[in-house]
């Protein structure tokens, strides 16, 4: 039996999604909880391996098990064995041809910036603080050049192992909600650190250090050293993963926090 789960987590205290020796990971916690409920070893496959400190409201995983359990066991039962900062949001039995990573057609991230002179306290681990005033409208205009198929070498981490830097950005929007600025971006896939590198350069434009045209110039240069520093992990969320309709996976609010699905 193959089962898919929707997973939400606060990544602040984890060394990323992927299981590693001697450090805490989201994958290890989830597999341990699932193994207890299934009463057999469970290994999971995810839609996107988030980095250390990155969060998710829309991570999708699948696993194969011989255990027969009610849906409540895979949701509430698993949640009872998980730490408070990881939770199962939904469960669905899927066809054998489903794969959390390889069946996905697009992924969507939201990056939240707290744009205020003073740092936040309540949301300190869920946003990235920028004390400089930011012009969200300039950031929005600058980001539009990213739409479509492009070579994202300028926004690709040096250690990225992807075979190609080409990605197809389907949606990008920058909006302000009071003191919060949200960068919302959806693509067929992302190269390593792509969203955080894009946000780092948009911040330079937003605070007036660079012109609106700088983003397009960086894209054309295909040179990571010419772009801004990588933005912090704190404000980044994997909010949704798209799959072909015939898999009929549950749809839940993307968030995070106060954000509606149609915002951003």
From Swiss-Prot:
Its EC number is 5.4.99.12. It catalyses: uridine(38/39/40) in tRNA = pseudouridine(38/39/40) in tRNA. SUPFAM superfamilies: Pseudouridine synthase. Gene3D superfamilies: Pseudouridine synthase I, catalytic domain, C-terminal subdomain, Pseudouridine synthase I, catalytic domain, N-terminal subdomain. Keywords: Isomerase, tRNA processing. Pfam families: PseudoU_synth_1. Formation of pseudouridine at positions 38, 39 and 40 in the anticodon stem and loop of transfer RNAs. Homodimer. This is tRNA pseudouridine synthase A. It comes from Yersinia pestis.
């Amino acid at each position: 039996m193959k089962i898919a789960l929707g997973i939400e987590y606060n990544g602040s205290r984890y060394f990323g999604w992927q299981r590693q020796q001697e450090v805490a990971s989201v994958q290890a916690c989830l597999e341990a909880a699932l193994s207890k409920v299934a009463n057999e070893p469970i290994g999971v496959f995810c839609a996107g391996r988030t980095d250390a400190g990155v969060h998710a409201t829309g991570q999708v995983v699948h696993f194969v098990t011989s255990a027969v359990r009610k849906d409540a066991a895979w949701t509430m039962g698993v949640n009872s064995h998980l730490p408070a900062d990881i939770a199962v949001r939904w469960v669905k039995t899927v066809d054998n041809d489903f794969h959390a990573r390889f069946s996905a057609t697009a992924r969507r991230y939201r990056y939240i910036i707290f744009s205020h002179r003073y740092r936040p306290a309540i949301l300190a681990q869920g946003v990235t603080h920028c004390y400089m005033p930011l012009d969200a409208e300039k950031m929005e205009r600058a980001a539009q050049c990213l739409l479509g198929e492009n070579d994202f070498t300028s926004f690709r981490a040096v250690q990225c192992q992807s075979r190609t830097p080409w990605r197809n950005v389907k949606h990008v929007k920058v909006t302000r909600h009071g003191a919060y600025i949200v960068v919302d971006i959806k693509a067929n896939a992302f190269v390593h650190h792509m969203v955080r590198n894009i946000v780092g350069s948009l911040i330079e434009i937003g605070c007036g250090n660079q012109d609106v045209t700088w983003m397009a110039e960086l894209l054309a240069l295909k040179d990571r050293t010419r772009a801004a520093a990588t933005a912090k992990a704190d404000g980044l969320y994997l909010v949704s993963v798209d799959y072909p309709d015939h898999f009929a996976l549950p749809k839940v609010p993307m968030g995070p926090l106060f954000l509606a699905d149609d915002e951003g």
